[in-house]
């Protein structure tokens, strides 16, 4: 049955093609005037095709969002994309879990510039543990909160340097170890991406102890003074600051 429609009327059963003057279209199978079975819909803002039950998408379906230029493919439950699916955006592809058409759970996203995120999502954002590969060759492994590095993580730089420690709001924040080379590293406390407070610098057999502020050394101190300040203010980190370079390298390579 093929008809042109200006309004909704009449009972429909079986295959039907509905055409509206504004360009809307429905093609599929009806039962008691409701779409049941495979159908495709063309609307002003979106296109939709898949398995329907009583006018609602249930089963495999594909949704094209014309306003946001996105395509969703996967399994739908009561009109919502849930479980494993695919989202194709203007400059990225996402493969993973959805709840109500929103990225939730484990997934992998690849951008057109070859940057990649693989890990946990919540409410469409990186949340939890994940790995991000940057186009410049760097990669970050660790915890995320709302698309920003937050918690414990490891930043690997393209020049071979590495930072392992805590982040907040996408910046180094808290205790961290910065590996310059195999025999050179620094143990520092950070604040908003800058070294603050006590720091220990190791280069081979040479060790320096300092106090930092705004990423600059404001005072050099001896080992006894340093350890006493650690005991007074950062006692939980005392054992780490006692490690030698081999122990620190072993720790960083095992994480």
Per-region residue spans from a language model:
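Conserved anchor residues at repeat-unit boundaries in beta-strand-based tandem repeats, strongest
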Residues: 1-13, 25-36, 47-58, 71-82, ...
